[in-house]
Structure formats: structure tokens, C-alpha cells
Amino acid sequence: MSFETLNKSFINGKWTGGESGRTEDILNPYDQSVITTASLATGKQLEDAFDIAQKAQKEWAKSTTEDRKAVLQKARGYLHENRDDIIMMIARETGGTIIKSTIELEQTIAILDEAMTYTGELGGVKEVPSDIEGKTNKIYRLPLGVISSISPFNFPMNLSMRSIAPAIALGNSVVHKPDIQTAISGGTIIAKAFEHAGLPAGVLNVMLTDVKEIGDGMLTNPIPRLISFTGSTAVGRHIGEIAGRAFKRMALELGGNNPFAVLSDADVDRAVDAAIFGKFIHQGQICMIINRIIVHQDVYDEFVEKFTARVKQLPYGDQTDPKTVVGPLINERQIEKALEIIEQAKTDGIELAVEGKRVGNVLTPYVFVGADNNSKIAQTELFAPIATIIKAGSDQEAIDMANDTEYGLSSAVFTSDLEKGEKFALQIDSGMTHVNDQSVNDSPNIAFGGNKASGVGRFGNPWVVEEFTVTKWISIQKQYRKYPF
């Protein structure tokens, strides 16, 4: 199926052209070819979408568990039936390899599968004992209302569905704005899937627009009860300021400076395998990506030798070639930012073990070794195929280095002693730590989220149910109650 025609906003069940008079070309990052051209929606259209979503939500909240499950099942079916075409569109739009794009679609479908398991949580009633004679206490779980959802360019379909599916499963409505660079895989394919599934008009509205048109409209509109955002910590702080003033809930997955620690008793070959994947999947453009490789001095030389040898063999180029491992960065701005980081590291005197190069819009891998944990490169979220290896004198120093960052999203540790690995993991101040694995892990039934400057809230069942619903206490006095006056 061709998805290039899905270049309009989806508002109130209709494909609606933007009224701004402005358009945005959606480009293939590898060759800059135009995939399609989107017309951008206005701030007024966004306001209308929130009004529509609010009205639609009141009816959707009355839907049955079976109704919601059926919609999710049909949306899943649409994605599965169009699997190959969707994978190719994700690759073309994001610059992600076929490997990455396949993983992304599989994760998206898994989110829908999991969402079907908790549609019955809505409307659940729990009776709680009362110390007042004749009183019955009931706690109801109700939809939260309208959700404002904003997703990034890197894993657009997965990170969009992570908010949209639970919202719909739990009786909410959604106004969703994908990054315009990945508007199709991050927005309109999802809208098409739910249109196919028979979701009532207005429950999901997908806005193709940009900040120039809508400003902070996704944040300041009084209708949404929760802002779900995945992106930079800087933007997350801005959202926090606005949401805090309005007492809105937030679900924020933000930046990361994720450590990958290799202890003295680690299987170095296994650690290298994990580090190669966890550093270079999607060219390093993932919030959970390995940002610092911290290696115990006893295995440091062996690790560096084996890691750099593997890096030099990674195939790069056109992301739609199934053999490619390292594809293009998303845009020129990201390339320039990466090159600036590289030049600064060179200026700082950090040893370059593998020197990559720019080939068109592809940046081949760079590996810096012997970096200080306080260096600029070690304290910067790289979002590029740049590896930084740091030597640790002891396990405790590795822990201290791992925690020496404002971020706390994901982390990993390699050791042959699993008990020691688990104890190490508990000392890392991050939302997620993986023993004998790399840092890029996700599943729809775990508590996904970060600590410190890496976010607020948790995705994954059952934690997401708490995020996207509200509880209400209703007490029923069944017999006359005596009052003190």
C-alpha cells in the first residue's frame, strides 16, 4: 500500500488539509528525496481538534470493554496486514535501517496487544471498608479525559502508539502531534489504522503542523488533562513549567546519558556484542542508547581492541538496503551537531581509536577512548554513531561514574556474577538497568521510564493504567448517621 497520500491532518474522522497556507516536505534522510508534502494545520484547527476530542471522549467513555478491545484488534490487524509497506515507510522517513524499522513495527503491534489486556480496567469498582457505621466506600476507575500527545522523530510509530493505544483502551480521546519530519509513520498511518478499525470520529485526532503555527498550543490548551511527551529534557522542563501551573498530569520520557559498565569478570565477547548493538542501532538516535561505555581496567584493553575491530566492519549506507547497519542521521542539523561534538573531543585531546567520516548524510562510526567521565563528550547526549569508552579503576568507581550525570533513563552492566550484577544495578540511579544486556530495551508490560532529568511517570502495563485514568471515591450512607452537632 502507498502511504504517501496520508499527508493531511486527521480531525473528527476526516482527512483535513492544513489551513495555514504553508507546507512541509517530508524527506528521505539518505538522499533528501521528497516522500510527500504535508499541508500544515493552524492554531485554530488545533483548538477545534481539542474541542472535538472533548465531545467525542464523553461518548467513548461509555463504550464497553468489548468495543474498545475490538477497535484495538482491528487496528492491530491493519498494521499486520500492511507490514512490509509500513516497515519500508518507517525506514524511508526516519532513516532507520530495515532492522530498526522491523523492530519498531513489532514493538508497536506489541503495544496494541498489551492494551487489549487492560481495557477491562476501566469502570472497575473496588469496595473499601469504612469506619463509619452503615457506610459503603467504592473506588471507581474512570477515564482521565483528553490526552495531548507529542512524539519525536526517532521511533515515531512506537513512541506515538505508546500514548495513543492506552488512551483509547481506557476511554480517553487524543490529540496527537507527531514530529513533522516523520508525520506518516508517527501519525497518519496510525490514524488510518484506527479509521479502518471503526474508531468513532473525534476520539483520535492527528495534527500535521509545527511550532511556528501552533506555538505551545499542545501544552496550554485547557482541555487536555495529561501531556504525554517524548523528546529532549530542555523541552520537557518547558512542559513541566506549563503543566505545573495548570495542574495537568505529565508523562515525560526525556534525554539520557546511559552508561554501559563492563566489570572485571565480564565475558568480554558478549559485552562487545551487546555494546555494538546498543550503541549503533538507529545511528545512536535513541534516548536509551549507550552513551558511555565504562570498562574496568582489568579488561579495558581487550574490550577496546575487540570493540573497535567490530566497529570498523559495520556496513553503512542506504537504510533501505537490508544489509545496512548504519544509515543516515535524520537531518543536516543533527549531522552538524555530531561533527561539532567530534571536533570538540579532538580539541580536548581525547584519543580517537576509530575515525569515521561523512558520506553524504551518513556519518560512519567514531570511537573515542580514554575519555574522562567529566569531559564534555562524556556528559553530552550524543544522539549519533559516536562511542565514548572510559576506563574505571574498580567496580565502585564504575558505579560512581555511571551515576555522575543529571540523567537517569537506562543503563546496563556486564558481569559473570549475576548476584553482583543485580546489586550493581540497584545502585545505579536510573529507571531501568539491564544485567548482561545493553541499554536499549522496551516492553509494553514493564515499568518504562527514567529518573532525575530523564522523565516523569512510567509507561507499560499496569503502570500506564494509573497514568491514563483517574480514581473516584463514592461513599454511600445506607443508614442514618449521627453527627456531633
Curated annotation (Swiss-Prot):
GO-annotated molecular function: aldehyde dehydrogenase (NAD+) activity
Active site location: E253, C287
Disrupted-gene phenotype: No effect on vanillin degradation.
The residues that hold NAD(+) are: G231, S232, T233, A234, V235, G236
Domain of life according to the entry: Bacteria
Expression induction = Activated by SigB in response to stress due to ethanol.
Spell out the reaction equation it catalyses.
an aldehyde + NAD(+) + H2O = a carboxylate + NADH + 2 H(+)
EC number(s) recorded for this UniProt protein: 1.2.1.3
Q: Which UniProt keywords apply?
A: NAD, Oxidoreductase, Stress response
Membrane-traversing stretches? none
Which EC class heads this enzyme's classification?
oxidoreductase
Checking PROSITE patterns in the record gives: ALDEHYDE_DEHYDR_GLU (PS00687)
Per the record, a Pfam family? Answer: Aldedh
Name the InterPro entries on file: Ald_DH/histidinol_DH (IPR016161), Ald_DH_C (IPR016163), Ald_DH_CS_GLU (IPR029510), Ald_DH_N (IPR016162), Aldehyde_DH_dom (IPR015590)
Q: Which family does it belong to?
A: Belongs to the aldehyde dehydrogenase family.
Report the protein's function: May contribute to protect cells against stress due to ethanol and related compounds.
Q: What is this protein called?
A: Putative aldehyde dehydrogenase AldY
